[in-house]
Design a protein with these regions (language model features):
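ALDH superfamily catalytic-core signature
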Residues: 1-115
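Conserved C-terminal structural/oligomerization subdomain of aldehyde/semialdehyde dehydrogenase
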Residues: 98-181
Protein backbone atom coordinates (compact mmCIF):
# COMPACT_ATOMS: atom_id res chain seq x y z
CA UNK A 1 0.00 0.00 0.00
CA UNK A 2 1.01 3.58 -0.51
CA UNK A 3 0.65 5.65 2.63
CA UNK A 4 2.99 8.53 1.80
CA UNK A 5 4.20 10.45 4.83
CA UNK A 6 5.09 14.07 4.13
CA UNK A 7 7.16 16.26 6.44
CA UNK A 8 6.52 20.00 6.47
CA UNK A 9 9.83 21.49 7.59
CA UNK A 10 10.16 24.66 9.64
CA UNK A 11 10.63 27.72 7.49
CA UNK A 12 8.70 26.39 4.50
CA UNK A 13 5.89 28.59 3.20
CA UNK A 14 2.76 27.32 4.98
CA UNK A 15 0.40 28.66 2.33
CA UNK A 16 2.37 26.96 -0.43
CA UNK A 17 2.41 23.68 1.51
CA UNK A 18 -1.37 23.90 2.04
CA UNK A 19 -1.96 24.62 -1.65
CA UNK A 20 0.26 21.73 -2.77
CA UNK A 21 -1.41 19.38 -0.28
CA UNK A 22 -4.86 20.17 -1.65
CA UNK A 23 -3.57 19.60 -5.18
CA UNK A 24 -1.94 16.28 -4.24
CA UNK A 25 -4.87 14.89 -2.26
CA UNK A 26 -7.83 16.53 -3.95
CA UNK A 27 -7.09 16.18 -7.64
CA UNK A 28 -7.91 12.46 -7.79
CA UNK A 29 -9.90 12.00 -4.56
CA UNK A 30 -6.85 10.38 -3.00
CA UNK A 31 -6.87 7.34 -5.29
CA UNK A 32 -3.28 7.63 -6.46
CA UNK A 33 -0.83 6.52 -3.81
CA UNK A 34 1.53 9.45 -4.27
CA UNK A 35 -0.35 12.13 -2.36
CA UNK A 36 0.02 13.33 1.19
CA UNK A 37 -1.55 10.66 3.40
CA UNK A 38 0.14 11.61 6.70
CA UNK A 39 1.36 15.19 6.92
CA UNK A 40 3.71 15.94 9.81
CA UNK A 41 3.97 19.65 10.67
CA UNK A 42 5.85 21.75 13.26
CA UNK A 43 3.66 21.75 16.37
CA UNK A 44 4.24 25.45 17.02
CA UNK A 45 2.90 26.26 13.53
CA UNK A 46 -0.36 24.35 13.98
CA UNK A 47 -2.68 27.34 14.19
CA UNK A 48 -1.14 29.10 11.17
CA UNK A 49 -0.87 25.92 9.10
CA UNK A 50 -4.43 24.85 9.86
CA UNK A 51 -5.61 28.33 8.83
CA UNK A 52 -3.66 28.01 5.57
CA UNK A 53 -5.38 24.66 4.95
CA UNK A 54 -8.79 26.20 5.69
CA UNK A 55 -7.98 29.07 3.32
CA UNK A 56 -7.49 26.42 0.62
CA UNK A 57 -10.94 24.98 1.36
CA UNK A 58 -9.89 22.07 3.58
CA UNK A 59 -12.46 21.14 6.22
CA UNK A 60 -10.60 20.18 9.40
CA UNK A 61 -11.68 17.82 12.14
CA UNK A 62 -9.58 18.27 15.27
CA UNK A 63 -11.67 16.71 18.03
CA UNK A 64 -10.64 13.13 18.82
CA UNK A 65 -14.23 11.87 18.91
CA UNK A 66 -14.98 13.35 15.50
CA UNK A 67 -11.80 11.92 13.99
CA UNK A 68 -12.57 8.47 15.41
CA UNK A 69 -15.89 8.48 13.54
CA UNK A 70 -13.96 8.66 10.27
CA UNK A 71 -11.81 5.71 11.26
CA UNK A 72 -14.94 3.72 12.05
CA UNK A 73 -16.59 4.33 8.66
CA UNK A 74 -13.48 4.18 6.45
CA UNK A 75 -12.19 0.89 7.84
CA UNK A 76 -13.84 -2.37 8.85
CA UNK A 77 -11.67 -4.85 10.75
CA UNK A 78 -8.63 -2.83 9.66
CA UNK A 79 -9.50 -2.97 5.95
CA UNK A 80 -10.77 -0.11 3.76
CA UNK A 81 -14.51 -0.02 3.17
CA UNK A 82 -14.76 -0.39 -0.64
CA UNK A 83 -17.94 1.69 -0.91
CA UNK A 84 -16.06 4.80 0.27
CA UNK A 85 -12.85 4.40 -1.76
CA UNK A 86 -12.37 7.42 -4.02
CA UNK A 87 -15.60 9.09 -2.97
CA UNK A 88 -15.94 12.85 -2.67
CA UNK A 89 -15.21 14.45 0.70
CA UNK A 90 -18.88 15.34 1.43
CA UNK A 91 -19.93 11.71 0.82
CA UNK A 92 -17.32 10.41 3.27
CA UNK A 93 -18.18 13.12 5.80
CA UNK A 94 -21.88 12.21 5.57
CA UNK A 95 -21.04 8.54 6.20
CA UNK A 96 -19.22 9.66 9.36
CA UNK A 97 -22.21 11.76 10.45
CA UNK A 98 -21.09 15.23 9.31
CA UNK A 99 -22.41 17.73 6.80
CA UNK A 100 -19.70 19.74 5.05
CA UNK A 101 -19.95 22.16 2.11
CA UNK A 102 -20.83 20.43 -1.16
CA UNK A 103 -17.72 21.60 -3.05
CA UNK A 104 -15.21 20.50 -0.40
CA UNK A 105 -12.28 18.78 -2.10
CA UNK A 106 -10.20 17.72 0.93
CA UNK A 107 -10.70 17.01 4.62
CA UNK A 108 -8.01 17.11 7.28
CA UNK A 109 -8.07 14.84 10.33
CA UNK A 110 -5.85 15.67 13.30
CA UNK A 111 -4.50 12.56 14.99
CA UNK A 112 -2.48 12.05 18.16
CA UNK A 113 -0.42 8.98 17.20
CA UNK A 114 1.24 7.47 14.15
CA UNK A 115 1.58 3.85 13.08
CA UNK A 116 -0.65 1.04 14.27
CA UNK A 117 -2.01 3.19 17.12
CA UNK A 118 -4.54 4.73 14.71
CA UNK A 119 -6.28 2.99 11.80
CA UNK A 120 -6.32 6.31 9.90
CA UNK A 121 -2.59 5.90 9.31
CA UNK A 122 -3.35 3.13 6.84
CA UNK A 123 -3.94 3.80 3.15
CA UNK A 124 -7.23 5.73 3.01
CA UNK A 125 -7.72 6.13 -0.77
CA UNK A 126 -9.89 9.18 -0.28
CA UNK A 127 -9.57 12.98 -0.24
CA UNK A 128 -8.26 13.04 3.31
CA UNK A 129 -4.97 14.18 4.77
CA UNK A 130 -4.10 12.97 8.26
CA UNK A 131 -2.29 15.61 10.33
CA UNK A 132 0.16 15.19 13.21
CA UNK A 133 2.39 17.77 14.88
CA UNK A 134 6.04 17.24 15.76
CA UNK A 135 8.56 18.92 18.07
CA UNK A 136 11.84 18.32 16.20
CA UNK A 137 12.67 17.50 12.60
CA UNK A 138 14.32 14.26 13.70
CA UNK A 139 11.12 13.30 15.52
CA UNK A 140 9.13 13.95 12.33
CA UNK A 141 11.42 11.66 10.33
CA UNK A 142 11.18 8.97 13.03
CA UNK A 143 7.37 9.22 13.00
CA UNK A 144 7.30 8.98 9.19
CA UNK A 145 9.43 5.83 9.32
CA UNK A 146 7.39 4.33 12.16
CA UNK A 147 4.19 4.97 10.24
CA UNK A 148 5.53 3.21 7.16
CA UNK A 149 6.80 0.26 9.19
CA UNK A 150 3.54 -0.20 11.09
CA UNK A 151 0.84 1.03 8.71
CA UNK A 152 2.35 0.24 5.32
CA UNK A 153 4.17 1.99 2.55
CA UNK A 154 7.79 0.83 2.80
CA UNK A 155 9.39 1.05 -0.62
CA UNK A 156 6.72 3.36 -2.02
CA UNK A 157 6.67 7.17 -1.81
CA UNK A 158 7.33 9.93 0.72
CA UNK A 159 7.45 13.70 0.50
CA UNK A 160 9.01 16.72 2.12
CA UNK A 161 8.31 20.45 2.04
CA UNK A 162 11.68 21.98 2.86
CA UNK A 163 14.17 24.63 1.82
CA UNK A 164 16.92 23.09 3.98
CA UNK A 165 19.21 20.90 1.89
CA UNK A 166 20.60 19.11 4.96
CA UNK A 167 17.09 18.21 6.12
CA UNK A 168 16.14 17.01 2.64
CA UNK A 169 19.23 14.79 2.54
CA UNK A 170 18.66 13.56 6.11
CA UNK A 171 15.10 12.58 5.21
CA UNK A 172 16.03 11.04 1.87
CA UNK A 173 18.81 8.93 3.37
CA UNK A 174 16.58 7.48 6.09
CA UNK A 175 13.06 7.12 4.76
CA UNK A 176 12.61 3.60 3.27
CA UNK A 177 11.04 4.50 -0.08
CA UNK A 178 11.80 4.32 -3.79
CA UNK A 179 11.14 8.04 -4.30
CA UNK A 180 10.93 11.23 -2.27
CA UNK A 181 8.87 14.02 -3.76
Amino acid sequence: PGTPPVVLDRGYDLKEAAKMTVTAVGSDNGILCDGDNLLLYPQEEEEKFFQALKDEGVVLFEEKGDVEKFGAVLFHDGHPVPELVGKDAPVIAKAAGFDIPKGTKVMGLKIDAVGKANVLNKEIMGPIVVLKGYESFEEAVAMAIQNMEEAGGIGHTAGIFSNDRKHIEYYGERIPVARVL
